[in-house]
């Protein structure tokens, strides 16, 4: 199974793993799971950290990627073109980009955000 963590899931997995659901934690621990985080999440964390809305540091991100053995998924034009076809179930531009990536790459998204379930064809783990 290939999984992509949304931003809050990545942060929780690193700093507060007890906040993960059992299904999410189990999926992340499976040795056969390919775990990914979007470069979009790294941008979102950097933006929020710069605006003092988050205390998650660059070192936290780097350590989290290493500790969780995550592949950082680049964002491509192919991903961006998926945005044109997405309904607007919610307006968060970072989430929408992660959804577009997940659909383009056939990834399941690990997220506590119920709005993700509204996107047809999107696989969600929580």
Predicted features, each with a name:
Residues 45:
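Phosphate/NTP-binding elements of NTP-utilizing enzymes
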Residues 53, 57-58, 67-114, 125:
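Active-site neighborhoods of divalent-metal-dependent phosphate/nucleic-acid chemistry enzymes
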Residues 1-37, 51-63, 67, 105, ...:
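Short, well-structured N-terminal submotif of metal-dependent ribonuclease cores
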């Amino acid at each position: 199974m290939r999984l992509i963590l949304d931003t809050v899931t990545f942060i929780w997995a690193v700093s507060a793993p007890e906040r993960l659901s059992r299904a999410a934690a189990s999926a992340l621990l499976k040795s056969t799971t390919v775990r990914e985080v979007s470069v979009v999440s790294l941008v979102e964390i950097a933006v929020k950290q710069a605006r003092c809305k988050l205390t998650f540091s660059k070192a936290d991100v780097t350590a989290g990627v290493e500790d969780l053995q995550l592949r950082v998924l680049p964002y491509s034009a192919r991903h961006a073109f998926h945005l044109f076809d997405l309904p607007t179930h919610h307006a968060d531009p970072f989430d929408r980009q992660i959804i577009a990536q997940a659909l383009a790459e056939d990834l399941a998204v690990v997220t506590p955000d119920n709005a993700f379930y509204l996107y047809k064809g999107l696989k969600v783990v929580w």
